[in-house]
């Protein structure tokens, strides 16, 4: 392979690495949990990571219990699960 072809291949691989989202094997297991409103009724907006949608989605949280796939802000959710 010529040096130009090798350089092109290296550039394409680098671009692919940058644009590829975090794979599920690198994502914490709690990010795969379903949204859980919890048993309380102090309803507030929260965010959870949706493995099906591959993004963080807002949902209504009851204010207690639930599970670890529950974040106060979109930024917290994306930092933990959707990087």
UniProtKB/Swiss-Prot annotation:
Keywords: Disulfide bond, Protease inhibitor, Secreted, Serine protease inhibitor, Signal. Pfam families: Kunitz_BPTI. One of its GO terms (molecular function) is serine-type endopeptidase inhibitor activity. Its main location: secreted. InterPro entries: Kunitz_BPTI (IPR002223), Kunitz_BPTI_sf (IPR036880), Prtase_inh_Kunz-CS (IPR020901), TFPI/VKTCI-like (IPR050098). One of its GO terms (cellular component) is extracellular region. SUPFAM superfamilies: BPTI-like. The keyword Disulfide bond applies. Disulfide bonds join 31-81, 40-64, 56-77. Expressed by the venom gland. Residues 1-24 form the signal peptide. It is found in: Secreted. Residues 31-81 form the BPTI/Kunitz inhibitor domain. Belongs to the venom Kunitz-type family. Serine protease inhibitor. This is Kunitz-type serine protease inhibitor scutellin-3.
């Amino acid at each position: 392979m010529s040096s130009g072809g090798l350089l092109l291949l290296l550039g394409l691989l680098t671009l692919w690495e940058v644009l590829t989202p975090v794979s599920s094997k690198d994502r914490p297991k709690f990010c795969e949990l379903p949204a859980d409103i919890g048993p309380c009724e102090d309803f507030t907006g929260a965010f959870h990571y949706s493995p099906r949608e591959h993004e963080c989605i807002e949902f209504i949280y009851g204010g207690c219990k639930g599970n670890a796939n529950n974040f106060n802000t979109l930024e917290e959710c994306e930092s933990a699960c959707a990087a």
